[in-house]
């Protein structure tokens, strides 16, 4: 047991599942149901961000056709593990996230004008907070007993074109 385990307010098994044994997965077993996928998102959305914003968008890729299109956009080292995963999630962010202000911070609209006035600020804030939420997503995956294999080796412009053709 480490000092971190001794100081944690959650039990050691949870610390192990979320952190100590949570290495990036390269192989997967079992299935992920729609209910389990929803539970992952439900946990993710409550993680703290600036203004409690929720810019992260999760696109679950289940169909063989969609998965094949995604796999074609990945670097060679990521293709086999993505093809064999029971569920794949594309994590992106809503480029107009601040338009949902009343949903995540009702009654306190003053800061929204700051983001409406600066596309660069809105983009950087949305991107940064979506990265926080991506971390929460991985923690949610691990806390529900699943493996996670985050990756960055991909042609993201091709993924955007295929999965987000409207550009948002």
Which positions does each model-derived feature cover?
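Acidic, surface-exposed loops and disordered segments
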Residues: 1-168
């Amino acid at each position: 047991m480490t000092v971190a385990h001794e100081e944690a307010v959650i039990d050691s098994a949870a610390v192990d599942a979320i952190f100590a044994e949570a290495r990036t997965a390269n192989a997967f077993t079992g299935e992920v149901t729609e209910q389990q996928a929803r539970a992952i998102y439900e946990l993710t959305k409550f993680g703290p961000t600036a203004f409690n914003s929720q810019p992260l968008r999760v696109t679950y890729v289940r169909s063989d056709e969609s998965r094949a299109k995604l796999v074609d956009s990945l670097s060679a080292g990521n293709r086999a593990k993505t093809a064999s995963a029971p569920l794949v999630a594309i994590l992106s962010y809503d480029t107009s996230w601040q338009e949902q202000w009343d949903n995540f911070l009702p009654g306190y609209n003053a800061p929204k004008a700051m983001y409406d006035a600066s596309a660069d600020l809105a983009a950087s804030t949305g991107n940064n907070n979506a990265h926080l939420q991506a971390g929460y997503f991985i923690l949610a995956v691990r806390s529900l007993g699943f493996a996670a294999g985050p990756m960055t080796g991909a042609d993201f412009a091709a993924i955007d074109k295929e999965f987000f053709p409207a550009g948002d």
